[in-house]
Amino acid sequence: MHFEAYPPEVNSANIYAGPGPDSMLAAARAWRSLDVEMTAVQRSFNRTLLSLMDAWAGPVVMQLMEAAKPFVRWLTDLCVQLSEVERQIHEIVRAYEWAHHDMVPLAQIYNNRAERQILIDNNALGQFTAQIADLDQEYDDFWDEDGEVMRDYRLRVSDALSKLTPWKAPPPIAHSTVLVAPVSPSTASSRTDT
């Protein structure tokens, strides 16, 4: 989207009259909560594995640990990823706050246009031509300033989104070692039906 093509009234209104960052902050809190929950799951899973190592001995426990390794890595990566989502949401919120601070206030833009119209209406003898030109230059500056702010906002948001990686499905546990036989969908449904 080329924000530079929009007049300052549009860009400023989109920032000042928009929904604001509340929904993004709520999303960040939700991701943080999920991160805390999954970190607790990760720690519990690791404790369980350590308990099994203490209780068992021999090649079976080593086989179990090897089978669980991919899932442990996935769980660790998931927690990092959840934390990164929250962090990048806050980056997007900061980008919005900077844009909100730097955007030309709507009142300034409207005052410029209103004053210009008054001068045009009373410029029969050309006595206000210079002032009208000054107001037009100020309006052009508003246009450029708002376009630059929106460009920067877009770049900051794009940068934050680029740091988010696709979600990976959890790997199976113990499938390759045949410690736990894979359950087919038909078997799983028949077990739940009985």
Curated annotation (Swiss-Prot):
Q: Which InterPro entries does the entry mention?
A: PPE_dom, PPE_sf
| Superkingdom, taxonomy of origin | Bacteria
Does this entry carry the keyword Transport? no
For biological process, the GO terms are:
response to host immune response
Instruction: List localization entries.
Output: Secreted; Cell surface
Q: What does the UniProt function comment say about this protein?
A: The PE25/PPE41 dimer induces both a strong humoral and cellular immune response. The dimer induces necrosis, but not apoptosis, in mouse macrophage cells. It also induces activation and maturation of mouse dendritic cells and drives Th2-biased immune responses.
* Protein name per its UniProtKB record: PPE family protein PPE41
Name the encoding gene, please. PPE41
